[in-house]
C-alpha cells in the first residue's frame, strides 16, 4: 500500500476483503493460467482500501512437486476515511509453490515464494520478497473433496528489496506480516469457499480484516 494509506487508519475498525481465486490447467499439458480479484475495504464495505486484479501463466512439474508462475497485477489503492483520492501500482511477479503433506496426509501445506517488481505511483521502482505458508486441515475427510469442511491457516511475510523509495522517503526491510485463520468448505471437487480473520501488521500499524473467498479450479 502507498505510505499515505496507513497514515491515519483506525486500527480498531475491522476491514473486509472479498476475493475470488481461479486456476485452469490446459488439457494434457503442465501449463495453465491462474489469477485473482480482490476488493479490499478499510471497513465492512464502501471505503476502498485496494482493488487488486492479478493474472499469471503457470507451469507445473510433471511429478506435481512444484508449480511456477509468471504474472502481472494492477492495484488501485484508496486512502482511509472520507478522502476519495487513489493511487495505482503495476506489478510484475514470479513465484513458485511447493505442496507438502504431513501427519499421514492429514495436514495439507503449500509453501509459496514470490518475488515482485513494483511500479508504484509517485515512488521509485521497488522490489519485494514474500513467503507464504498455507495450511489446510480437513475435518471430516482425509482429502479436501466434495462436502469436506476444513480449517484454513496461513502466514505471509513481506520483505522490501530497497529502503529508499524516492522523494526522500524511506521504508524498513520488514514490510508487513499477515496471519490468517478461517473455515473452509469444498462445495465440490472444483469449488471451495472460505471465511476467516486476518491480522496485518506493519512496523507501525496492526489491523484486523474479515476475509471471504471463493476458490475455483477449471
Stretches found by the model and what they are:
Residues 26, 37-43, 72-78, 100, ...:
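Transmembrane beta-strands of outer-membrane beta-barrel pores
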Residues 20-24, 55-59, 94-100, 115, ...:
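Residues on the lipid-exposed face of transmembrane beta-strands in outer-membrane beta-barrel proteins
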Residues 1-10, 218:
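Bacterial Sec-dependent N-terminal signal peptides
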Residues 26-31, 62-65, 101-108, 139-149, ...:
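Short loop/turn motifs that connect adjacent beta-strands in outer-membrane beta-barrel proteins
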Residues 31-35, 53, 66-70, 107-113, ...:
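Transmembrane beta-strands of outer-membrane beta-barrel proteins
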Residues 153, 162, 174, 178-218:
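Predominantly the C-terminal beta-signal and adjacent terminal strand-loop region
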Residues 12-18, 49-53, 88-92, 123-129, ...:
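Residues that define the transmembrane beta-barrel architecture of outer-membrane proteins
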Residues 8-71:
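Start-of-domain marker
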Amino acid at each position: 500500500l502507498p505510505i499515505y494509506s496507513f497514515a491515519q487508519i483506525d486500527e480498531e475498525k475491522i476491514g473486509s476483503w472479498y476475493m475470488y481465486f481461479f486456476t485452469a490447467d490446459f488439457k494434457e499439458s503442465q501449463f495453465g493460467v491462474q489469477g485473482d480479484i480482490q476488493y479490499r475495504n478499510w471497513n465492512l464495505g464502501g471505503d476502498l482500501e485496494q482493488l487488486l486484479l492479478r493474472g499469471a501463466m503457470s507451469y507445473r512439474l510433471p511429478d506435481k512437486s512444484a508449480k511456477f508462475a509468471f504474472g502481472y497485477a494492477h492495484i488501485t489503492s484508496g486512502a482511509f476515511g472520507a478522502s476519495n483520492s487513489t493511487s495505482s501500482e503495476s506489478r510484475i511477479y514470479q513465484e513458485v509453490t511447493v505442496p507438502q503433506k504431513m501427519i499421514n496426509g492429514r495436514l495439507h501445506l503449500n509453501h509459496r515464494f514470490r518475488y515482485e517488481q513494483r511500479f508504484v505511483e509517485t515512488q521509485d521502482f521497488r522490489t519485494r520478497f514474500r513467503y507464504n505458508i498455507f495450511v489446510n486441515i480437513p475435518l471430516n475427510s482425509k482429502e479436501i473433496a466434495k462436502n469436506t469442511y476444513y480449517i484454513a491457516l496461513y502466514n505471509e511475510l513481506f520483505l522490501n528489496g530497497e529502503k529508499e523509495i524516492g522523494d526522500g522517503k524511506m521504508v524498513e526491510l520488514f514490510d508487513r506480516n499477515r496471519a490468517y485463520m478461517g473455515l473452509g468448505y469444498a462445495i465440490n471437487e472444483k469449488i471451495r469457499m472460505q471465511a476467516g480473520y486476518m491480522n496485518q501488521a506493519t512496523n507501525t500499524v496492526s489491523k484486523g480484516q474479515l476475509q471471504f473467498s471463493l476458490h475455483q479450479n477449471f
